[in-house]
């Protein structure tokens, strides 16, 4: 068994692992990265964020082609199969792997491909694909192994008609009808993707409102858009059993209803990838969802072992995971780059997309905060009229006395980009965080960014 010595060993090369490894390396530490694949990037690059967003982009282009009257002059609407669209999206994965591989090489981070597990608190055994075991000894170790779809034991995921959000990328045909169980972020994103391909979608939600953490007006807008695009949303439903057939699948619900479709996509929760880490060898224990507990410095109960990303739970976003990894390494090397990551914008890549940051109306009402609302509807924006993306709105919540911006909520094209302007103002200290910034600033014209000016005037005009 070969033995290698490092200052820091990072388990997992997804966003959290990459952020941790890069920050530790730039602080002068000798760093090793361990990943179970033969390529870096983690589930984010290979099965999650990158392929699903590339898929979405391709589907959005198809929708634009099929709905734009200008293109009718050159032909009829075109139909694309899911495998064809996926093949186009997969090209992005190889480009991401190449970019990320170069980051590790440039920063002198050694990458080991194999399954890593703790031998003790300062050493990790890596079982390579050829069976060779290598031992990495380190002063500090960061767990950033990510997560995978939660799979209930009573569902046969080996059935050819039953998929989760990882295996759906191996779907070799375009179903006429698809059941999606779980209406969280992933479920809603895939509902948009498949409905955009003309698939009838049954979206089963075990709550009474889609994405209930969102501002209710935004959630309602998404619900309306789904119902207008061949997505049947069924609220307050729980599965009883899933019956796989040769020609389809039947979802039996506890309410007594039955739904039949060509395939079922399970999108109900995720599990941390901790079961093969040998946590028992260092006295750590994951919770029922495979997640480990950390403090605000991202340190576990074992003083030299840290955690970041999906494996520690909330918010389970790639954007947050990268910053958590950087912060875990910053805390570890004490280079001033540590911060507890909690001011995270939400980005949901439905069609149209959704993004928000800060408080929503329900939260402010419950807290008895005297707030006011300003809105800008995209249908009135010149840039939206030019692009044809006229569905959507920007909503600003602000304190009616101090004018402090308390929340920004956006539904529509480029929402995940638009929200960052509001995020920047909300992060300003004291009186610099004010809705007046948007009326005292000149925006390029025509842009979607000027929706902030329109929404700010709308809100300020409500004051008396």
From Swiss-Prot:
Protein name: Soluble pyridine nucleotide transhydrogenase
HAMAP family cross-referenced by the UniProt entry: SthA
Originating organism: Pseudomonas syringae pv. tomato (strain ATCC BAA-871 / DC3000)
InterPro entries: Class-I_Pyr_Nuc-Dis_Oxidored, FAD/NAD-bd_sf, FAD/NAD-binding_dom, FAD/NAD-linked_Rdtase_dimer_sf, Pyr_nuc-diS_OxRdtase, Pyr_nucl-diS_OxRdtase_dimer, STH_gammaproteobact
Annotated SUPFAM superfamilies: FAD/NAD(P)-binding domain, FAD/NAD-linked reductases, dimerisation (C-terminal) domain
Annotated EC: 1.6.1.1
Flavoprotein as UniProt keyword: yes
Role description: Conversion of NADPH, generated by peripheral catabolic pathways, to NADH, which can enter the respiratory chain for energy generation.
Molecular function as annotated in GO: dihydrolipoyl dehydrogenase (NADH) activity; flavin adenine dinucleotide binding; NAD(P)+ transhydrogenase (Si-specific) activity
GO BP field: 2-oxoglutarate metabolic process; NADP metabolic process
Subcellular localization: Cytoplasm
Cofactor(s) demanded: FAD
